[in-house]
Amino acid sequence: MKNRIILCLGCLLAFLQLRAQVNTNQQHLCNPNSFSIVLLGDPQNYVKYDYNQPVFELMTAWTAHHIDSLRVKAVLCTGDLVDQNECILPPFPRFGNLTSREQWTFVSRAFGRLDNKVPYLISTGNHDYGYTRSENSMTRFPEYFPIERNSQWKKTIVAATNNRNGLPTLENAAMEITDEHWGRILIIAVEFAPRDEVLSWARELVATPRFKDHTVILITHSYLTGFDSRRITKEGYKITPSNTGEGIWQKLVQPSANIRLVLCGHYATPNERLDYTTGFRTDKNAAGHDVHQMMFNCQALGG
């Protein structure tokens, strides 16, 4: 009898332990035939302080955990992976407490949770170039994000063009995903303040016979403001040649019949108001189709 009681208690404990390991907070799709694309806003303020880094680590960990339950086909990031691209000391305490190498190492490790599981594209930001904010074309991005690091890219990256230093990198790249209901989707990421030749490359790419019937998503770092959702027309960065949000619209988005969504980050005001860290507008392209344009940069809200 005593042995039976011990056996029953053992089975009960094993059952309770199994129940405790079930994740009751895992998210699921309302429509099992749908899919997800995850958008990560600018990471820079999570990355530049060691005590903020767990916030971004949680974002990529959560995404990796939900790849199957949310049918995540791609992850996109609006850029500014670091706050200073090339500094051995932060310029001022409010600009962080880590060197540039420590920032790049961390953000690379955080994205490592997604490697070989899901393809992702990053639109490099102004802080990813120069020393602190695009004083020149120097960037550590290709060093930390070579195409070889994620096996999913071999299946999905379909085009790329050279960066400002004449190197073929993922700063300007296109990724193709498919869905039985949506059909074929082309996602294009372009460098911060893209040059005319990059916009021409993207415009010609979406018009080719291979991609002209795809639904195209463009992700770029700087494009819309928050609050009133204006396309940006002027910025004070030294990096040249360049285009602002309005230039991207006029030279790439508006003339292209199949670009239907533009995503960006960059703009934020640290005043705890969501409407200052997000933006949205819809305009017609040359073919008369709606183009939805969204800015998302919630780092100023603390998460």
Predicted regions and their residues:
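Bacterial Sec-dependent N-terminal signal peptides
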Residues: 1-23
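N-terminal active-site segment of His-dependent metallophosphoesterases
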Residues: 20-99
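Active-site-proximal beta-strand elements of phosphoester/diester hydrolases
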Residues: 34-47, 183-193, 219, 292-297
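Active-site glycine-centered loops adjacent to acidic/histidine catalytic or metal-binding residues
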Residues: 42, 79-80, 125-126, 221, ...
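Short catalytic/ligand-binding loop motif for oxyanion handling, primarily in non-cytosolic enzymes
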Residues: 47, 83-86, 128-133, 197, ...
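Stable alpha-helical elements in mature extracytoplasmic
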Residues: 52-63, 78, 103-110, 137-141, ...
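His/acidic metal-ligating clusters that form di-metal
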Residues: 64-74, 116, 164-176, 181-280
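Extended active-site neighborhood of metal-dependent phosphoesterases/phosphodiesterases
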Residues: 87-200, 210-211, 273-295
